[in-house]
UniProtKB/Swiss-Prot annotation:
GO molecular function: cytochrome-c peroxidase activity; electron transfer activity; heme binding; metal ion binding
Location (main, coarse): periplasm
Protein name: Cytochrome-c peroxidase IdrP1
Enzyme class, broadest EC rank: oxidoreductase
Record keywords, A-Z: Heme, Iron, Metal-binding, Oxidoreductase, Periplasm, Repeat, Signal
PANTHER family, A to Z: BLL6722 PROTEIN (PTHR30600:SF10), CYTOCHROME C PEROXIDASE-RELATED (PTHR30600)
Cofactor(s) named in the record: heme c
Residue ranges of every copy of the Cytochrome c domain listed in the record: 49-157, 203-354
Listed EC numbers: 1.11.1.5
Binding positions for heme c 2 per the UniProt entry: 218, 221-222
Catalytic activity: 2 Fe(II)-[cytochrome c] + H2O2 + 2 H(+) = 2 Fe(III)-[cytochrome c] + 2 H2O
Amino acid sequence: MGHIRSIRLALAVAAVCTAASAAAGDAKFPPLGPLPPVPVPADNPMTADKVALGKQLFWDNRLSGDGSTPCVSCHLPALGWGDGGAISRGYPGTKHWRNSQTIVNSAYYNKLFWAGSVTSLEAQAPSAAEGGVAGNGDRSLMEMRLRFIPEYVAAFKNVFGADWPRMTQAYAAIAAYQRTVVSDATRVPFDRWQAGDKAAMSAEAQRGYALFSGKAGCIACHNGPLASDQRFYNLGLPEHPDLAEDPLLQITHRWEQYQKGTTEDGYRHADRDKGYYYQTKNPKDIGKFRTPSLREVKYTGPYMHNGTLATLDEVVAFYNAGGGTAPGKTDKLKPLGLTEQESKDLVAFVEALSMTEPLIHDDPKLPGDYQPLATQ
């Protein structure tokens, strides 16, 4: 009996030490925790009708160039609101070089896209729908398509008081809808555990939380309710092999160099994705990308800005090795010295930041039978 009591005491002490270690790590940075209410801009208040309209538009192929790339084509609910590939499919005739990010919880970011090129969902929507390697839609043409559909004319009149649909209003509606694509804290093991349900998170995940906030140091960049500091770092990640090997990707990537205002030399030697540099034009920012949220990552692989890491096990192994070897890597990354069990524990905790089941929205019924000629 004395031996059993000793074991129980040791386990209790270990649990206390684990919690204390995690709390100490959290104290240095904004703590992890449930997401606050979704921020809503004063000039785009949310209503049920606006959200419903935005959902239809998010799914509607008519808001793209040739009718083949609606928003949902790269952000499928069943694929974690990404497209499931290492790099985004891109518009027909082009090939992208970055991973299609999940839009879950995108309402909480202060900068969107991997390189932080826009600061609101209202600005993000046209960048995607009209971007040459994404939707490639012409604004005036898409606007006229909406005006051919009586149901949309009536819906825009109801929501915005407009006689005719305008794309600025369409993008506002899409942004309102995206603000509903968020995690539910009651279905997230870590959030439930923090709220007092100590059975919500496994012992493995609890050990992983201590590592996350302590030895592994993940909390230094993945902090706050979003599990992201929303800053930009160069992780030394290798380029996706297709960047050097795929002619169509090279053509598209070099065209983008001109679009982003790089130098002639930068165009001629476009052998890497320069990331945040495209926004700042500061050479120190070459290869930097925004810290992604860790919420819902259980469902959003492949990972990193170019999808080169297929699983969370690979992600942890990458950081355990001290990151990659590409030029300009942040000095924040050092080898972690995690054991095999510690790596498993860390993955278990990161998965506990996702809901127990993926967030799924059913396809909406789209109005009208008019389609662009290219799709007929």
